[in-house]
């Protein structure tokens, strides 16, 4: 029996309308009744996730910013990882050949240089939103991550530019087909979950995890039981071909799987 369950949010626990379904909420409550520790492992900001947990009265650990922050049930900061100031400066000040929008994160929030209302659709559940700033005036010493949002082919070309400029000084990953992230070296959900399990006196073998994108790769590959969403990025399925694939987030597939796991643990599972 797993002792900790870690969940990605977008494309995994959240439905396509960016809400948590009632079946999902009910299943999370059942896990807590079984004394299974809940952990939300997401690229979203800690401020947003703390608001969501408060609104739902959920007790859960938080891995946010794709591993840049880990918080306890009480909101205590257990782990932090920031981009080196020189890396943040290069990414912010360089003229990149891209049409993608740039987004900067630190403990105070989400910042960008121009309005992009379409992006806010993903935050209707929480009301979290960006702040408009002069990117060149952004404090460089506290940047957790930098994201580029746009067309996937354009971002793939940008990834090459970033790698040529940064080399091994940053970790680049796609958190979605339309979002490329620049993170501190060694920073990912799997590394953050390792920190959390050590804090809790658990091993990664005691954990199950669910995800759909390349920013979930290390987490899914390191736990005792990793599960890939049916709507996952093809690259993730190719990287972890040995992991089982469950259903689509629109059908609350995580809840579907966990209900079976709780009720019929000795029977084989089918996502149908």
UniProtKB/Swiss-Prot annotation:
Signal peptide: none annotated. Its cofactor is Mg(2+). The active site is at 8 (nucleophile). It comes from the Bacteria. Keywords: Hydrolase, Magnesium, Metal-binding. GO terms for molecular function: 4-amino-5-hydroxymethyl-2-methylpyrimidine diphosphatase activity; magnesium ion binding; phosphatase activity. It catalyses: 4-amino-2-methyl-5-(diphosphooxymethyl)pyrimidine + H2O = 4-amino-2-methyl-5-(phosphooxymethyl)pyrimidine + phosphate + H(+). Its EC number is 3.6.1.-. Mg(2+) binds at residues 8, 10, 212. Catalyzes the hydrolysis of 4-amino-2-methyl-5-hydroxymethylpyrimidine pyrophosphate (HMP-PP) to 4-amino-2-methyl-5-hydroxymethylpyrimidine phosphate (HMP-P). NCBIfam families: Cof-subfamily (TIGR00099), HAD-SF-IIB (TIGR01484), PRK15126.1 (NF011705). PANTHER family: HMP-PP PHOSPHATASE, PTHR47267. This is HMP-PP phosphatase. It comes from Escherichia coli O6:H1 (strain CFT073 / ATCC 700928 / UPEC). The gene is cof.
């Amino acid at each position: 029996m797993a002792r900790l369950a870690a969940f990605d949010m977008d494309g995994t626990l959240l439905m396509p309308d960016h809400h948590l379904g009632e079946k999902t909420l009910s299943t999370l409550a059942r896990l807590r009744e079984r004394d299974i520790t809940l952990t939300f492992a997401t690229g979203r900001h800690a401020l947003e996730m703390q608001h969501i947990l408060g609104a739902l009265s959920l007790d859960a650990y938080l891995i946010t910013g794709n591993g840049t922050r880990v918080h306890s049930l009480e909101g205590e900061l257990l782990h932090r990882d920031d981009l080196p100031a020189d890396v943040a400066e290069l990414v912010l000040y360089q003229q990149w050949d891209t049409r993608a929008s740039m987004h900067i994160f630190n403990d105070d929030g989400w910042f960008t240089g121009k309005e992009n209302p379409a992006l806010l659709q993903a935050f209707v559940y929480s009301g979290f939103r960006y702040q408009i700033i002069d990117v060149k005036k952004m404090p460089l010493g506290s940047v957790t991550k930098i994201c580029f949002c746009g067309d996937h082919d354009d971002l793939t070309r940008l990834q090459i530019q970033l790698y040529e400029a940064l080399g091994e000084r940053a970790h680049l990953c796609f958190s979605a087909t339309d979002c490329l992230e620049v993170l501190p070296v060694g920073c990912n959900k799997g590394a953050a979950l390792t920190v959390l399990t050590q804090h809790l006196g658990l091993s990664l073998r005691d954990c199950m995890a669910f995800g759909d994108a390349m920013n979930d790769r290390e987490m899914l590959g390191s736990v005792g039981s990793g599960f890939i969403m049916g709507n996952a990025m093809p690259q993730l399925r190719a990287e972890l071909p040995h992991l089982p694939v469950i259903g689509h987030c629109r059908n609350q597939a995580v809840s579907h799987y966990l209900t079976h796991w709780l009720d019929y643990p000795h029977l084989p599972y089918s996502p149908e």
